[in-house]
Amino acid sequence: MAASSTLESLTEALRRLPGVGVKSAQRMAYHLLQHDREGALRLARALEQAVATVRHCERCNTFTEAPVCSTCLDPARERRQLCVVETPADQAAVERSGSYHGLYFVLMGRLSPLDGIGVHDIGLEKLLARATDGEVQELIVATNFTAEGEATAHVIAQALKGRGPSVTRLARGVPVGSELEYVDLGTIAHALSDRR
């Protein structure tokens, strides 16, 4: 049985989501059309509304519906600290920890020369302007511990060298509750060299 062009378009659209291959996209499309047409319509409306109303915060670059997000407007936040993360999901993870009360800057990515992502694509100029505005005293680089995240952290640290705020990096170490025999060797090596 040949699929309709509309069904193929839906499958292709679903494949744009991270981690969704052809088979998963087909299963989702068939499920929505066969078992949950009302859910499919709600999803379509929610996507349309999000695309129309969600924008980047003028200060920190995260997602918001207002020109400036609620975190940036919160007077209780520690304004001398600025935590740099790759994505809004990373920002949410830091917030869930409950241990950070400063402000954020969301890069919306990381350097990846192989993928054609350079310093202009991650808003480095905007970050530098924010970090050197005289208010920020500590910039905490919380990029991921991947090759791209490390490269991004290095470029940020070099760009800010001697320009104002101190630059710190998240510590690496053995996760709480883990057993050493199951921890990867790189993490053990970093935990030993960065011990306090």
UniProtKB/Swiss-Prot annotation:
One of its GO terms (biological process) is DNA recombination. Keywords: DNA damage, DNA recombination, DNA repair, Metal-binding, Zinc, Zinc-finger. The keyword NAD does not apply. It holds the Pfam family RecR_HhH. GO terms for molecular function: DNA binding; zinc ion binding. InterPro entries: DNA_Rcmb_RecR (IPR000093), Rcmb_RecR (IPR023627), Rcmb_RecR_Znf (IPR015967), TOPRIM_dom (IPR006171), TOPRIM_RecR (IPR034137). Residues 80-175 form the Toprim domain. A zinc finger (C4-type) spans 57-72. Gene3D superfamilies: 3.40.1360.10, 6.10.250.240, RecR Domain 1. May play a role in DNA repair. It seems to be involved in an RecBC-independent recombinational process of DNA repair. It may act with RecF and RecO. Belongs to the RecR family. This is Recombination protein RecR. It comes from Methylibium petroleiphilum (strain ATCC BAA-1232 / LMG 22953 / PM1). The gene is recR.
